[in-house]
Design a protein with these regions (language model features):
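Substrate-binding strand-loop-helix patch
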Residues: 190-197, 219-237, 249-258, 309
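A hydrophobic C-terminal alpha-helical subdomain
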Residues: 84, 251-333
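Substrate-positioning beta->alpha
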Residues: 106, 186-207, 215, 227
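Glycine-/Pro-rich loop/turn segments that contact NAD(P) or position catalytic residues
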Residues: 91-177
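N-terminal Rossmann NAD(P)H-binding glycine-rich loop of SDR-like oxidoreductase domains
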Residues: 8-33
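Non-catalytic, hydrophobic alpha-helical segments
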Residues: 20, 199, 203, 231, ...
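Glycine/proline-rich active-site loop of Rossmann-fold NAD(P)-dependent oxidoreductases
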Residues: 166-173, 206-217, 241-243
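NAD(P)H-binding glycine-rich loop region in Rossmannoid oxidoreductase-like domains
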Residues: 43-117, 129-131
Length: 333
């Protein structure tokens, strides 16, 4: 990126209240863009709406239902013209019903509304795991990616590796003197995690960077790829402790999936839990790096890096009380 001042654009944002959405909105506002965020409060009432407004300072906040095309048009776009659609929207759980409703169908509605509003460019936050799809949410994301590419709009599809919050769930247990949990030997997967702020900046830069147009963009954070074992090896010294690990066999995850799936045939709520377990197993056994289609292997060197903050910088800030860990629906530990 050059130091040139960005051309201000009207930007319509989905998913702005999530952790990545908030940093993306902040980066867009800082770059001088006129940002309108379309959100649905987690709870009804004026207080919840005010919280959303405070989270998205500098942006205009509009409320409605992203799954309802009429609400998108009436409450969101409101007959106005926009230049860019930015989506950080994602299903909360990844179970099939949720995934197809949000990761695919809601985005299809938004794409149609955006085209009607004159949008010419869409920046989509996707996920690097879609390059090896095994679960419903990955197929749903891929289906929308394909629709966006075929839409005629300029597109920037950003596929980040791992988020800091996804790799920070064990800080509290290690502080309590417990071992760091790894699957297998703790070395069978690796990732190049990226911070919320660095990813938000990357997404915002897609509006100005011509090299990111009509591209699928895998991106990780700075530095070398790290394994779960290396995460623990860095965390313990920050606490003045000797590294200790608890090794969990992947076969245990397989057993949990099998049991929940069997019970889910007679107890429907457990079927959803079985899918969550399958998602957990996927992340426990697959690296979040660029996949080389020729070899079928993950390649850290082929995974682009962006930003300045490393996972271990973040660990240090959390332990100093300078930052906090926001856990999500995909929390494992």
């Amino acid at each position: 990126m050059t130091g040139a001042t960005p051309t201000p654009r009207r930007v319509f944002v989905l998913g702005g209240t999530g952790t990545i959405g908030r940093t993306t909105v902040r980066a867009l506002v800082q770059r001088g863009h006129e940002v309108v965020c379309f959100v649905r409060p987690r709870t009804a009432g004026a207080e919840a709406r005010q919280q959303s407004v405070q989270l998205l300072s500098g942006a205009t906040v509009r409320f409605g239902d992203v799954t309802n095309p009429a609400s998108l048009a009436r409450d969101g776009f409101q007959g106005e013209r926009f230049d860019v659609l930015v989506s950080c929207l994602a299903s909360r759980t990844g179970v099939p019903k949720d995934a197809w409703a949000i990761d695919h169908q809601a985005h299809m509605h938004a794409l149609a509304a955006a085209k009607a509003a004159g949008v010419s460019h869409m920046v989509l936050l996707s996920a690097i795991c879609v390059q090896k799809p095994r679960r419903a949410f990955q197929h749903a994301k891929l289906a929308f990616e394909a629709a966006l590419i075929a839409s005629g709009l300029t597109y920037s599809i950003v596929r980040p590796t791992a988020f800091f919050k996804s790799l920070s769930g064990q800080i509290a247990r290690v502080k309590k003197g417990k071992p760091f949990v790894v699957f297998g030997d703790g070395m069978m997967t690796a990732c190049k995690p990226i911070s919320d702020a660095d990813l938000g900046a990357y997404l915002a830069e897609c509006l100005e960077d011509a090299c990111r147009r009509d591209k699928v963009l895998p991106v990780g954070g700075p530095g070398q790829a790290v394994t779960p074992k290396q995460q623990g090896e860095h965390l313990f010294p920050l606490l003045g402790q000797t590294p200790r690990f608890k090794h969990v066999p992947v076969a245990l995850l397989d057993a949990i999936v099998w049991i929940l799936a069997a019970l889910g045939r007679v107890i429907p709520p457990l079927a959803a839990k079985a899918e969550l377990a399958r998602i957990g197993r996927y992340y426990a056994t697959e690296s979040m790096l660029v996949l080389d289609p020729a070899t079928g292997r993950y390649d850290a060197n082929a995974t682009p890096s962006s930003g300045t903050e490393t996972l271990f910088d973040f660990y240090a800030r959390v332990l100093k009380g300078e930052s906090s860990v926001e856990r999500g629906d995909h929390a494992v530990y």
